[in-house]
Amino acid sequence: MSNFRVQRYHSSDSNHWNTFVANAKNATFLFHKDFMEYHKDRFDDYSLMIFNVNNKLVAILPAHKVDSVLYSHQGLTYGGLVLSSKVILSEVILITKCILEFLEKKEFSKLNLKIIPSIYNCFPSDEMEYICFLLEAKLSRRDALAVLDITNQIPISRVRKRGIEKGKANGLVVKEENDFTSFWNELLIPNLKERYNTKPVHSLFEITYLKSKFPNQIKQYNVYQDDKIVGGVTVFVTDNVIHPQYISGNKAFNNELGGLDFLYHYLISNVYKNEKYFDFGISNENQGKQVNESLHYWKESFGARTIVQNFYEIEVKNHSLLDTVLI
């Protein structure tokens, strides 16, 4: 008989779920149900909760289903198995086996995981990387993230310094704002439409709603020249990591005004100088198989260096491979 029990998440579990997220060793506010459910109409939620023999919640899996595949999570930047800091490797192996057996009974064929990058963890949390190896999981994608260690910075390049000085010479001013309207409507939406014929993942209504739920985790910084908005960035703040979620500016912002260099330097050197990591994000295309070289170099010229985020495809039936691991 298993020492763990798996059950589907239900709306009545929200407080229990959110309390667990707040104390887990590898979670951020993106796993809070107030964040996950802003777009619940787009996904068929199939999140899981795992309890031990004492009926204590020890792990959760933010997830949704598409046919016979369970994803964790296509609607989030990252996903994977979220763990209590008290669980140890042997328990995580048994928890994973229990999850896969549960999914097999529910006639799932695959579990796809989008692992949370290590910098977001509060404690070492590579259990699932090891377990994916044990399960002979397919590494379906690997992205390269450019990350700056704010506490131990590699010197910024001379090119970036020139951009920063250009921003100062052009009289640029950065202000934190609570209203996203001007940035969204005047810059972000038009630019995404013109360049990529797409829209922001979050609508103005959605980002405003999320800001109301997470006022300390979602921040907006606009850049002004002569009181006119010329650029801006929407930042997601987690315990260890500062991550620009959206960045946009007018046609003069990047080159003529030095706005992008000026804005990022301001955030790193002033607003978030006491934080741990600044995650510039990925520069990948084609499911991680190609890198936008100039974009990644721009991030590296701030002193950022590369870590990876792994995506795994697990065959549910392979749970038997975990039977003989513990000796």
What is each residue range found by the language model?
Residues 43-45, 105-108, 218, 273-276:
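Short, high-confidence coil segments that cap the C-terminus of an alpha-helix
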Residues 76-122:
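A gly/proline- and charged-residue-enriched helix-loop-helix capping module
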Residues 60-61, 82-84, 88, 93-100, ...:
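Aromatic (often tryptophan-rich) hydrophobic motifs at membrane interfaces
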Residues 20, 102-105, 270:
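Short alpha-helical functional segments enriched in proximate histidine and acidic residues
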